[in-house]
Amino acid sequence: MSAIRATNLSKRYGGTTAVSDLSFDVEPGQVTGFLGPNGAGKSTTMRMILGLDRPSGGSVLVDGRPYGELRHPLRKVGALLDAKAVHGGRSAYNHLLAIAQSNGIPAGRVNEVLDAVGLREVARRRVGGFSLGMSQRLGIAAALLGDPEILIFDEPVNGLDPDGILWIRTFMRKLAAEGRTVFVSSHLMSEMAQTADHLIVIGKGRLIADTSVQEFIGRSSQGYVRIRSPRLAEVAELVKVGELYPDHLRVTAMNTLEIGTLTARAGIPLEELTFVQPSLEAAYMELTKDSLEFSS
Protein backbone atom coordinates (compact mmCIF):
# COMPACT_ATOMS: atom_id res chain seq x y z
CA MET A 1 0.00 0.00 0.00
CA SER A 2 1.25 3.47 -0.88
CA ALA A 3 2.15 5.71 2.05
CA ILE A 4 0.35 8.66 0.43
CA ARG A 5 -2.25 8.39 -2.35
CA ALA A 6 -3.87 11.37 -4.05
CA THR A 7 -6.80 10.61 -6.35
CA ASN A 8 -8.30 13.27 -8.65
CA LEU A 9 -7.38 15.86 -6.01
CA SER A 10 -8.62 19.41 -6.65
CA LYS A 11 -8.66 22.67 -4.73
CA ARG A 12 -10.36 25.91 -5.72
CA TYR A 13 -10.28 29.28 -3.98
CA GLY A 14 -13.20 31.23 -5.38
CA GLY A 15 -12.60 31.43 -9.11
CA THR A 16 -8.97 30.32 -8.84
CA THR A 17 -8.03 26.66 -9.27
CA ALA A 18 -4.89 25.85 -7.27
CA VAL A 19 -4.90 22.07 -7.81
CA SER A 20 -6.74 20.26 -10.60
CA ASP A 21 -7.48 16.53 -10.89
CA LEU A 22 -4.13 15.54 -9.37
CA SER A 23 -3.36 11.84 -8.83
CA PHE A 24 -0.11 10.30 -7.56
CA ASP A 25 1.33 7.80 -5.08
CA VAL A 26 4.25 8.30 -2.69
CA GLU A 27 6.05 5.09 -1.76
CA PRO A 28 8.01 4.15 1.39
CA GLY A 29 11.76 3.62 1.49
CA GLN A 30 12.65 6.46 -0.84
CA VAL A 31 12.87 10.23 -1.11
CA THR A 32 10.18 11.56 -3.43
CA GLY A 33 10.84 15.06 -4.73
CA PHE A 34 7.78 17.27 -5.30
CA LEU A 35 8.65 19.85 -7.93
CA GLY A 36 6.92 22.66 -9.76
CA PRO A 37 7.17 26.40 -10.46
CA ASN A 38 5.96 29.00 -7.97
CA GLY A 39 2.19 28.86 -7.79
CA ALA A 40 2.06 25.30 -9.12
CA GLY A 41 0.09 24.06 -6.09
CA LYS A 42 2.79 22.21 -4.14
CA SER A 43 2.14 23.78 -0.73
CA THR A 44 -1.63 23.55 -1.22
CA THR A 45 -1.29 19.84 -1.99
CA MET A 46 0.81 19.26 1.13
CA ARG A 47 -1.73 21.12 3.25
CA MET A 48 -4.51 18.90 1.88
CA ILE A 49 -2.46 15.78 2.67
CA LEU A 50 -2.18 16.99 6.28
CA GLY A 51 -5.86 17.93 6.59
CA LEU A 52 -5.11 21.66 6.87
CA ASP A 53 -7.07 22.45 3.70
CA ARG A 54 -10.20 20.63 2.58
CA PRO A 55 -10.14 19.38 -1.03
CA SER A 56 -12.75 20.79 -3.40
CA GLY A 57 -12.77 17.42 -5.12
CA GLY A 58 -11.08 14.05 -5.03
CA SER A 59 -9.30 12.58 -2.04
CA VAL A 60 -5.92 12.07 -0.44
CA LEU A 61 -5.12 9.17 1.89
CA VAL A 62 -2.28 8.70 4.34
CA ASP A 63 -1.58 5.05 5.10
CA GLY A 64 -4.96 4.20 3.62
CA ARG A 65 -7.13 6.78 5.37
CA PRO A 66 -7.71 10.54 5.50
CA TYR A 67 -5.29 12.33 7.80
CA GLY A 68 -8.14 13.43 10.08
CA GLU A 69 -9.07 9.80 10.75
CA LEU A 70 -5.61 8.76 11.97
CA ARG A 71 -5.80 7.76 15.65
CA HIS A 72 -2.33 9.06 16.49
CA PRO A 73 -1.40 11.35 13.60
CA LEU A 74 1.99 12.47 14.94
CA ARG A 75 3.05 8.84 15.27
CA LYS A 76 2.15 8.24 11.64
CA VAL A 77 3.12 11.52 9.91
CA GLY A 78 5.66 14.21 10.72
CA ALA A 79 5.73 17.47 8.78
CA LEU A 80 7.73 20.65 8.39
CA LEU A 81 5.81 23.31 6.45
CA ASP A 82 7.12 26.54 8.00
CA ALA A 83 10.27 26.52 10.13
CA LYS A 84 9.49 29.95 11.61
CA ALA A 85 5.98 29.03 12.80
CA VAL A 86 7.23 28.77 16.38
CA HIS A 87 6.74 30.95 19.48
CA GLY A 88 10.00 32.92 19.56
CA GLY A 89 9.97 33.25 23.34
CA ARG A 90 10.05 29.52 23.99
CA SER A 91 13.18 27.44 24.25
CA ALA A 92 13.70 24.66 21.73
CA TYR A 93 13.21 22.12 24.51
CA ASN A 94 9.94 23.61 25.74
CA HIS A 95 8.59 23.95 22.20
CA LEU A 96 9.14 20.25 21.58
CA LEU A 97 7.93 19.29 25.06
CA ALA A 98 4.61 21.06 24.49
CA ILE A 99 4.08 19.16 21.24
CA ALA A 100 5.04 15.87 22.88
CA GLN A 101 2.75 16.33 25.88
CA SER A 102 -0.23 17.31 23.72
CA ASN A 103 0.21 14.16 21.63
CA GLY A 104 0.85 11.61 24.36
CA ILE A 105 4.53 11.25 23.50
CA PRO A 106 6.96 10.56 26.40
CA ALA A 107 9.03 13.57 27.47
CA GLY A 108 12.21 11.54 27.05
CA ARG A 109 11.66 11.59 23.31
CA VAL A 110 12.42 15.35 23.26
CA ASN A 111 16.10 14.88 24.05
CA GLU A 112 16.31 12.01 21.56
CA VAL A 113 15.17 14.18 18.64
CA LEU A 114 17.30 17.11 19.80
CA ASP A 115 20.30 14.78 19.65
CA ALA A 116 19.21 13.49 16.23
CA VAL A 117 19.23 16.99 14.70
CA GLY A 118 22.25 18.30 16.60
CA LEU A 119 20.45 20.87 18.79
CA ARG A 120 21.01 19.37 22.25
CA GLU A 121 23.56 22.04 23.24
CA VAL A 122 21.17 24.91 22.41
CA ALA A 123 18.02 23.22 23.71
CA ARG A 124 17.46 25.87 26.42
CA ARG A 125 17.96 28.86 24.13
CA ARG A 126 14.99 30.88 22.92
CA VAL A 127 13.91 29.94 19.43
CA GLY A 128 13.56 33.60 18.44
CA GLY A 129 17.35 33.84 18.31
CA PHE A 130 17.83 30.80 16.08
CA SER A 131 19.29 31.09 12.59
CA LEU A 132 17.23 29.76 9.69
CA GLY A 133 19.31 26.60 9.62
CA MET A 134 18.74 25.98 13.33
CA SER A 135 15.02 26.66 12.89
CA GLN A 136 14.89 24.11 10.08
CA ARG A 137 16.56 21.55 12.33
CA LEU A 138 14.07 22.31 15.09
CA GLY A 139 11.20 21.84 12.65
CA ILE A 140 12.61 18.48 11.61
CA ALA A 141 12.98 17.52 15.29
CA ALA A 142 9.28 18.32 15.81
CA ALA A 143 8.40 16.19 12.79
CA LEU A 144 10.36 13.28 14.26
CA LEU A 145 8.82 13.42 17.74
CA GLY A 146 6.31 10.64 17.13
CA ASP A 147 8.89 8.47 15.33
CA PRO A 148 6.62 8.55 12.25
CA GLU A 149 6.79 6.37 9.16
CA ILE A 150 5.99 9.29 6.85
CA LEU A 151 7.83 12.65 6.68
CA ILE A 152 6.62 15.66 4.68
CA PHE A 153 8.97 18.62 4.20
CA ASP A 154 8.02 21.81 2.31
CA GLU A 155 11.13 23.59 0.97
CA PRO A 156 13.39 22.48 3.87
CA VAL A 157 16.62 23.82 2.32
CA ASN A 158 15.35 27.29 1.35
CA GLY A 159 17.84 29.94 2.43
CA LEU A 160 20.35 27.52 3.95
CA ASP A 161 24.12 27.67 3.51
CA PRO A 162 25.94 24.72 1.85
CA ASP A 163 26.62 23.00 5.19
CA GLY A 164 22.94 23.18 6.14
CA ILE A 165 21.86 21.86 2.75
CA LEU A 166 24.31 18.96 2.98
CA TRP A 167 23.08 18.09 6.48
CA ILE A 168 19.41 18.00 5.43
CA ARG A 169 20.21 15.99 2.29
CA THR A 170 22.15 13.41 4.29
CA PHE A 171 19.45 13.27 6.96
CA MET A 172 16.64 12.71 4.43
CA ARG A 173 18.63 9.94 2.75
CA LYS A 174 19.12 8.33 6.17
CA LEU A 175 15.38 8.46 6.91
CA ALA A 176 14.57 6.81 3.57
CA ALA A 177 17.22 4.14 4.18
CA GLU A 178 15.38 3.28 7.40
CA GLY A 179 12.31 2.46 5.30
CA ARG A 180 10.45 5.71 5.95
CA THR A 181 8.55 7.71 3.36
CA VAL A 182 10.11 11.11 2.65
CA PHE A 183 8.07 13.57 0.55
CA VAL A 184 9.92 16.84 -0.02
CA SER A 185 9.33 19.92 -2.15
CA SER A 186 12.20 22.07 -3.39
CA HIS A 187 13.21 24.68 -5.95
CA LEU A 188 16.86 23.55 -5.97
CA MET A 189 17.19 21.16 -8.89
CA SER A 190 20.84 20.36 -8.24
CA GLU A 191 19.91 19.37 -4.71
CA MET A 192 16.98 17.19 -5.80
CA ALA A 193 19.26 15.43 -8.29
CA GLN A 194 21.45 14.33 -5.36
CA THR A 195 18.65 13.63 -2.90
CA ALA A 196 15.54 12.24 -4.59
CA ASP A 197 14.88 8.74 -5.93
CA HIS A 198 11.55 9.62 -7.51
CA LEU A 199 9.95 12.83 -8.79
CA ILE A 200 6.41 14.13 -8.92
CA VAL A 201 6.29 17.30 -11.02
CA ILE A 202 3.25 19.56 -11.25
CA GLY A 203 2.47 22.76 -13.14
CA LYS A 204 -0.58 24.98 -12.77
CA GLY A 205 -2.00 22.42 -10.36
CA ARG A 206 -1.80 19.51 -12.81
CA LEU A 207 0.49 16.49 -12.96
CA ILE A 208 3.33 16.83 -15.46
CA ALA A 209 5.54 13.87 -14.53
CA ASP A 210 5.62 10.96 -12.07
CA THR A 211 8.84 9.03 -12.61
CA SER A 212 12.32 8.21 -11.34
CA VAL A 213 14.97 10.93 -11.47
CA GLN A 214 16.97 9.18 -14.19
CA GLU A 215 13.91 8.48 -16.35
CA PHE A 216 12.83 12.10 -15.97
CA ILE A 217 16.19 13.43 -17.12
CA GLY A 218 16.47 10.97 -19.99
CA ARG A 219 12.94 11.56 -21.22
CA SER A 220 12.92 15.33 -20.98
CA SER A 221 16.39 16.36 -22.15
CA GLN A 222 19.43 15.07 -23.96
CA GLY A 223 23.13 15.70 -23.75
CA TYR A 224 25.04 17.68 -26.33
CA VAL A 225 28.58 18.45 -27.47
CA ARG A 226 29.74 21.98 -26.71
CA ILE A 227 32.31 23.41 -29.13
CA ARG A 228 34.33 26.60 -28.79
CA SER A 229 36.67 27.78 -31.53
CA PRO A 230 38.12 31.03 -32.91
CA ARG A 231 36.60 29.86 -36.22
CA LEU A 232 33.20 28.85 -34.90
CA ALA A 233 31.25 29.72 -38.06
CA GLU A 234 33.49 27.38 -40.05
CA VAL A 235 32.87 24.57 -37.55
CA ALA A 236 29.12 25.13 -37.86
CA GLU A 237 29.35 24.94 -41.64
CA LEU A 238 31.51 21.82 -41.42
CA VAL A 239 29.24 19.78 -39.11
CA LYS A 240 26.03 21.16 -40.70
CA VAL A 241 24.04 20.35 -37.55
CA GLY A 242 23.73 22.10 -34.23
CA GLU A 243 22.71 25.37 -32.65
CA LEU A 244 25.08 28.31 -33.01
CA TYR A 245 25.45 30.64 -30.02
CA PRO A 246 27.64 33.77 -29.81
CA ASP A 247 30.46 31.94 -28.04
CA HIS A 248 29.86 28.24 -28.73
CA LEU A 249 28.14 25.64 -30.88
CA ARG A 250 25.86 22.90 -29.52
CA VAL A 251 25.65 19.64 -31.43
CA THR A 252 23.41 16.68 -30.52
CA ALA A 253 23.62 14.54 -33.67
CA MET A 254 27.39 13.86 -33.55
CA ASN A 255 29.80 12.70 -30.85
CA THR A 256 33.10 14.28 -29.81
CA LEU A 257 35.20 11.78 -31.79
CA GLU A 258 33.34 12.50 -35.02
CA ILE A 259 33.54 16.26 -34.55
CA GLY A 260 37.20 16.17 -33.53
CA THR A 261 38.12 14.10 -36.58
CA LEU A 262 36.29 16.44 -38.96
CA THR A 263 37.79 19.63 -37.55
CA ALA A 264 41.31 18.14 -37.42
CA ARG A 265 41.13 17.19 -41.09
CA ALA A 266 39.93 20.70 -41.92
CA GLY A 267 42.72 22.24 -39.86
CA ILE A 268 40.29 24.15 -37.62
CA PRO A 269 41.59 24.70 -34.07
CA LEU A 270 39.25 23.99 -31.15
CA GLU A 271 39.31 25.62 -27.73
CA GLU A 272 36.72 23.25 -26.27
CA LEU A 273 35.14 19.96 -27.30
CA THR A 274 33.03 18.71 -24.39
CA PHE A 275 30.09 16.35 -24.01
CA VAL A 276 27.62 17.99 -21.62
CA GLN A 277 25.54 15.51 -19.65
CA PRO A 278 21.80 16.15 -19.39
CA SER A 279 20.84 17.59 -16.01
CA LEU A 280 17.76 17.57 -13.82
CA GLU A 281 17.62 21.35 -14.01
CA ALA A 282 17.63 21.36 -17.82
CA ALA A 283 14.96 18.66 -17.93
CA TYR A 284 12.84 20.49 -15.37
CA MET A 285 13.07 23.82 -17.21
CA GLU A 286 12.14 22.19 -20.50
CA LEU A 287 9.16 20.33 -19.04
CA THR A 288 7.75 23.21 -16.98
CA LYS A 289 8.36 26.10 -19.40
CA ASP A 290 4.64 26.30 -20.25
CA SER A 291 3.62 26.21 -16.57
CA LEU A 292 5.51 29.25 -15.29
CA GLU A 293 3.39 31.84 -13.50
CA PHE A 294 5.85 34.54 -14.61
CA SER A 295 8.53 34.32 -17.27
CA SER A 296 10.95 36.70 -18.92
Task: Give each language-model segment a name.
Residues 2-6, 11-184, 189-203, 209:
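ABC transporter nucleotide-binding domains
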Residues 101-104, 213, 218-221, 240, ...:
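A generic structural signal for secondary-structure junctions
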Residues 59, 224, 269-272:
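Residues at or immediately flanking beta-strands
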Residues 6, 33, 242, 260-263:
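Small side chains
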Residues 67-68, 74, 99-104, 227, ...:
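Alpha-helix C-terminal capping segments
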Residues 255-296:
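C-terminal coupling/interaction segments
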Residues 169-254:
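ABC transporter nucleotide-binding domain
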Residues 7, 228, 274-276:
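Solvent-exposed beta-strand sheet faces enriched in polar/charged residues
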